[in-house]
Amino acid sequence: MTDIRILLVDDEPDIREVVDVSLGLDREFATRACASGADALVTAAEWSPSLILLDVMMPLMDGPTTLANLRKNPRTAHIPVVFLTARTQASEVEQYISLGAQGVLSKPFDPMTLAASVRSYLPPATASHAP
């Protein structure tokens, strides 16, 4: 049964595949992936994910700009966003949080613990579906 919708936004096909496979092992997760910030804005508004995993460095529209646009739309403003990035120095993480992200997951990540990490950022009502 899939109750938890995760939208992954990353321009790297390999990252999208690893996240999809890792979260797909848990039957409670349904995932969709986008390769750009522009696609993410449309998909998030239409699909209403439980959480968005958002790459920081993407061409055309980077993660922080995508987050700002998500926050401007009443249909997506409430969706928790977690940045997925290799840029995890304290000052950068502080900046991401100040922009409205709920947290940061560092690349590279451990595919075996990704589901648990994602669950830790879910709103309590959503996470309570977890075993």
Give the ranges of each region predicted by the language model.
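Two-component/phosphorelay signaling modules centered on CheY-like receiver
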Residues: 13-32
